[in-house]
Structure formats: C-alpha cells, structure tokens
Amino acid sequence: SNKIMLGVFRAAAYITTLVLVAIIAYVVINGLPHISLDFIFGWPQGVNAEGGIWPTIVSTVYVTALAMLICTPIAVLAAVYLAEYAKQGKVVELIRYAADALASVPSIVMGLFGYALFVEAMGLGLSMVSAALALALLMLPIVMRTTEEAIRAVPRYIRWGAYGLGATKWQVVSKIVLPSAFGRIATGIVLAIGRAIGETAVVLYTMGQAINLPISPLDSGRPMTVHLYLLANDGINMNAAYGTALLLMVIILAFNLFARFLSRKRR
C-alpha cells in the first residue's frame, strides 16, 4: 500500500509539473517568434494593434509601483502592531480573519468595488491612482500576513537580549526585529507585486484602456493584462497577444524566482 500511495503522490507531482511546462512551452512557441526590440519598445498602431507594446509596459510598471508604495507602509505597520503591540484576543483574531477574507475576494469583485469607490465616489476617474488603490487592497493581506509571520519568526531571545541592554520597545522593533525579518518581508512584497502585475479585472475597471504613456497619477493607461485581454478577446492580432503573454509570463516568473531567492538567502 505504501508503494501505491507513493506512486499516486509522485504521479500528482508529475502532472502538476507537466501542466506548468505545457503552458510555458505553448506560450513560448507561439510568442517567441513575435518578440523583437520593435515589439517591446514600439507603440501599437492601427485598429489591428500592429507595432509594439511599450505604453502597456510603462503603464504596468507605473501602476504596480504606485500600488506597492501605497500598500507596503500600511501592511508593515499593521503587521508590527499585530505581532508586537496588540494584546491577543478577539479583536486581533477579527483583524486576521478580515485580512484572510480580503485575500480571498475575487478580483472581479475588487474591480467593481474600486470602480464604485475610487472612480465614481471619490471622483478620481479611470486613472493610475484609482487602479493603484484597488490593487493595493489586493496586495495588502499578502504583505501584512507575510510580514506578521516574519516578525513572529524572529527568535525571542534576541528581543530579551536587547531589553536586557536597556533598549525600548520601539528600538527593539525598529533596530532588531524588522531588520532580522527583512528577507521574508521582502519576499511577501515581491509575491504581492507578482500578483498585482497579473491582475486584469481590477485594472480594467479602474484604469481604462487608453494607450498612452502615463505621467500624472491621474492619467489613464492600458496595462499589459488588459492589452492581452482585448487582443485575445477580439481576435484582432493574435501574434501580438502571444507576444504580450510571453513577456507578461516572463515578468511574473522572474518575480516569483526572485521571491524564492530572497527566501532561501535569509535561511
């Protein structure tokens, strides 16, 4: 029976790996022939979106960086409070439950919520800042929970040694705990960025579809995911769709590999 179960587990692992390899191979085979410098740094032209995707790359980087700047301070401060200052009880458990529930909200729901709140109610319009605020809500629970776990993983004896030398609570947190947990915190941030880059529904409802180079946070734009969705959905230029998919996949895989590198480096 042990050999049978071992075979079942091994088959499940192989199937998972083969599915991933098949997806990557399919995208690479169809997308690689269309990748060039003109495609990466050019502008879409005409109704068939011929040319390149440079404005969509800029929009993706812009909105993701803005979302990270909004999310990270809030998530880290909340995690520090939960791990170091808050008394464990029902309130803290409620906050953790709310964070976990927020992480499970479908992106389409978050997109509609972002449109209703940021675009309409707050009057920010279809813009980078509207999309960044909505993406920050998706990133927040990932960074917060990862940071809290990273802080709790710092050995207690390090804190006790600092207290024994006369350090204050804030000095221990800022000078010892957070630097010790930095690797895992950075891993959580990188994973959250990877998820934000791959989101479509949220940015579709909050940023719009305009093909331009955004300068102000109030400018609209078209990220790579929305560009890919429009190309594939309308079937107007599947070559550009496969090329965009390949670049997007490479970016997300690079962030995931970087997160694994940070995690292993700090062990």
Question: Which residues fall in each region the model found?
Answer:
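Transmembrane-helix boundary motif in ABC transporter permease subunits
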Residues: A67-A99, L112, E120, A259-R264
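Periplasmic/extracellular loop-to-transmembrane helix junction in inner-membrane transport proteins
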Residues: S1-A11, V27-A67, L230-N239
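Glycine/proline-centered hinge or cleavage motifs at structural transition points of membrane proteins
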Residues: P106, L165-G166, P179
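Interhelical loop and adjacent transmembrane-helix boundary motif
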Residues: V47, G51, V203-M249
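C-terminal transmembrane helix and the adjacent membrane-cytosol boundary/short C-terminal tail
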Residues: E148, R152, R156, Y163, ...
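Transmembrane alpha-helices
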Residues: M68, T146, K169-Y205
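Generic hydrophobic transmembrane alpha-helix motif, especially the helices
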Residues: D100-L138
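Transmembrane alpha-helical segments of polytopic membrane transport and secretion proteins
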Residues: S1-I15, A259-R267
